[in-house]
A protein has these predicted regions:
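N-terminal alpha-helical "arm" segments
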Residues: 1-36
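Basic, alpha-helical nucleic-acid-binding regions used in initiation and control of genome expression
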Residues: 2-3, 19, 70-77, 285-287
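Charged, alpha-helical interface segments at or near domain boundaries
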Residues: 28-223
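Short amphipathic alpha-helix segments
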Residues: 232-245
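A short linear hydrophobic-aromatic micro-motif
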Residues: 250-254
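C-terminal structured domain segments
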Residues: 257-263, 267-294
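Helix-rich interaction surfaces within compact, conserved domain-sized segments
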Residues: 279-309, 314-315
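Non-Sec secretion/translocation targeting segments of pathogen effectors
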Residues: 325-349
Length: 349
């Protein structure tokens, strides 16, 4: 069964697995463009409902293909459970009122290149090749955070400028998505403590080796939020990079680990940008899902000039500064000494 046949099968049969109050529900599909991904979404809207969950059919199709024994009846029952158990309980009027959502705004960071089409229809700010976008936290429970992506039409509804939206989102983000900084070693240790009782002897030995290796590596810090989901934007919180520089007592490199976190490494002369860039490329290619990747580049924060930029650009600026300093010094040496000449006066009594 190909994907189109799968979609039609779900659309034609989903109501057979839903309660009686869904018999007049409207079943539709639409192409969804989200940050970092595009998919075909299924919506089942009961009469009178303003909002309804959009179910990712691409994701369900991949799961269906990966399990040959699964029937379409099982798939439809799964979708029906999602429809029934996950209605969106949202006050639509409140979402459309900017004063009601202003304190629920938060930012996300994504690849500007990978999301070019989506960003054409959404307010955003670029930080090099990273894009900051704006979202409203709709609800939060044990399953995670429900949110709404602010696009141009919603911004127009709010009647504010993109600049005002950015300013307000920067104020509220640290309260909605609380920042968290920890060392790589601490995270591995936390994992070790949580899982140690469930590990086999071989797994336990492997984790202990990883802990040993991490203690010999340069000190990386993980910048994310307390939920550790969509936490890469924390690096752009107001004064965050300045505070990080004070903590480290140094400039630092920033590695785009994924949309969920950034890695920070002090620029103490032990590593160079090229080595770090190779590391990012390898990790992206082997360990990060395509939908969660940011970029293959490495960034740098200059604590003296308070500049966030690509590491290559920082190196260029330093060379330009050194060249200018050498030029100024040379000009100073070539300038002749200007000694004060005293005029002799004849004095007569």
């Amino acid at each position: 069964m190909n994907f189109n046949e799968f979609v039609n099968e779900v659309k034609d049969n989903i109501k057979l697995f839903l309660p009686k109050d869904y018999e007049n529900a409207e079943v539709s599909t639409m192409e969804c463009q989200k940050l970092n991904r595009a998919y075909t979404g299924l919506m089942v809207r009961k009469e009178g409902e303003m909002l309804t969950p959009t179910i990712n059919l691409n994701q369900l199709y991949e799961a269906y293909k990966a399990q040959p024994g699964v029937t379409m009846e099982t798939v439809c029952r799964k979708i029906a459970d999602i429809v029934i158990e996950a209605p969106i309980q949202v006050d639509l009027k409140a979402i459309l009122n900017y004063e009601d959502v202003k304190d629920k705004l938060f930012i996300r960071v994504s690849s500007a290149e990978a999301n070019k089409e989506v960003l054409e229809n959404a307010p955003h700010q670029l930080k090099e090749d990273l894009a900051i976008t704006y979202h409203v936290a709709v609800g939060k429970d044990q399953d995670g955070l429900s949110s709404m992506f602010i696009k141009n039409d919603l911004l127009e509804q709010y009647g504010i400028s993109a600049e005002q939206l950015h300013e307000d989102a920067m104020k509220s983000s640290p309260h909605v998505m609380i920042p968290e900084v920890s060392s790589i070693g601490a995270l591995i240790d936390e994992m070790y403590q949580k899982n140690i009782l469930m590990l086999t002897p071989d797994e336990r030995e492997m984790l202990q080796e990883t802990l040993q290796e991490s203690s010999e590596m340069p000190t990386f810090f993980v910048v994310t939020n307390t939920d550790r989901i969509d936490g890469a934007g924390v690096i752009f919180y107001p004064e965050f990079m300045d505070s990080m520089g004070e903590l480290l007592g140094n400039d630092f490199f920033i590695l785009p680990s994924s949309i969920h976190e950034m890695l920070v490494l002090p620029d103490d002369g032990q590593v160079d940008a090229e080595m770090l860039r190779d590391m990012v490329k390898e990790v992206n290619a082997t360990q990060v899902a395509p939908a969660e990747r940011l970029t293959n580049d490495v960034y740098h924060f200059d604590t003296k000039d308070h500049v966030f930029e690509k590491a290559d650009r920082f190196t260029e600026r330093q060379k330009e500064k050194e060249a200018q300093a050498a030029k100024t010094e040379k000009a100073g040496k070539e300038q002749p000494d200007q000694k004060l000449k005293t005029k002799k006066h004849d004095m007569e009594l």
